[in-house]
Structures are given as C-alpha cells and as structure tokens.
A protein has these predicted regions:
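Bulky hydrophobic segments
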Residues: 2-123, 139-193
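Individual transmembrane alpha-helices with interfacial aromatic-anchor signatures
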Residues: 125-132
Length: 193
C-alpha cells in the first residue's frame, strides 16, 4: 500500500466519524428536549407490529420505520442529483443529518401537537431509541436505493407505499399530506370508519 492509498484510507473515515458525531448530537438534543430514552412502560421491544398502539414510536422499530426507509430513498435520489461529485459516504452523512434534523423537529412540541390535531391523538413523540432506529432505517434506505439504482428503488418505493396503505392505513406520502393539510375523509379512513 503506497502513500496515496494510505491518505485515501484516512480520508474515507471522516464521513463515518461525522455520522457518529451526528448521532451523538441528535441524541443529546432529543434528551435536552425531554424525550425519554425508552418506553415509560418499562419494557423494551426491538419490534412493535401495531401501528396504532401506545407502544408505537416507543421502541426500536415499528411499522412507521418503513417510512424512514423511504426517506432514505428520497435522500439518495436528491443527493445523487444535486451533489453527484460528493462521495456516496458523504451523501449518506448528509442524508443521516437531514433525518436527524427531522427527528428533532418531529419531536418538537409544535409538530407533536400538529400530529395530534391530524388524528394521532395518542402520539406523544418518539423515544430516543425509536428516533435512533428511524435514523438507522433512513441510512438503510439510502444504501438500499444506491444499490438498487433509481428505477428499481422507485418501484420498491411505490410498492412499499401501497403495502403501508393497506397494512397501517398510512404511508410516507399520506403522512406528509395529512401533516401539512389534514383532510377529514382521510382521517376517517385511517381511523377505520
């Protein structure tokens, strides 16, 4: 291994260190915002399969984790188009940073109240563990979209949206729409009426 390879190897560690620092920073910020580390129920689950339960957003993964995979897809596409000269690892860091910023915003009192007004009456915000799980799923989605390429990841995006609509009566697109502009018939459909 020559000097050039050694320098390149050392440079390639910086995006990974940046990711770790981002995760540490978002953890401290969420803690500062009053988020609990774990569910107040005193239990810890890797997976909660119910979309509308008191355990949703309180454990590592839940059905909404799939929407965070889709965040990763979208970030991969956008950063690939707008920052093609950046290495994929730096684009991954940008995606994880954007997702971390979203987790901080999503767990602000304003957005929690907005979700509650849009029909998520029992929603009190994510635990720190759930937010970190969401960020990890976004990173997974980014890497998966990079591996699959645009066309196949777009097909998977659409398929996941459809599956989520039938499974939990929600999806990334629907979540964004109802957060910005709640529509009564969508809220009624989501509630099962």
């Amino acid at each position: 291994m020559g000097l050039d390879a050694s320098v390149a190897d050392k440079r390639s560690i910086w995006p990974w260190l940046a990711i770790v620092l981002t995760l540490v920073a978002v953890t401290f910020q969420l803690y500062y915002q009053g988020r609990l580390w774990l569910c107040s129920c005193g239990q810890f689950f890797l997976w909660v399969g119910e979309a509308r339960s008191s355990n949703t957003s309180q454990h590592l993964l839940d059905p909404y984790s799939f929407t965070h995979v889709l965040h990763g897809f979208v970030f991969c596409w956008l950063l690939g188009w707008f920052a093609p000269r950046l290495s994929w690892t730096w684009r991954l860091w940008l995606a994880i940073t954007a997702e971390a910023v979203w987790e901080v915003i999503e767990n602000s009192n304003f957005v929690i109240q907005r979700y509650r007004e849009a029909g998520a009456l029992g929603y009190f915000g994510d635990t720190i563990v759930n937010s970190l799980g969401d960020i990890a799923m976004c990173g997974f989605g980014f890497v998966l979209a990079r591996y699959l390429g645009f066309v196949r990841s777009l097909a998977l995006f659409v398929a996941l949206e459809v599956v989520l609509l039938f499974w939990i009566r929600d999806s990334l697109v629907l979540n964004v729409v109802t957060l910005i502009y709640p529509i009564e018939w969508i809220e009624q459909w989501q509630a099962g009426y």
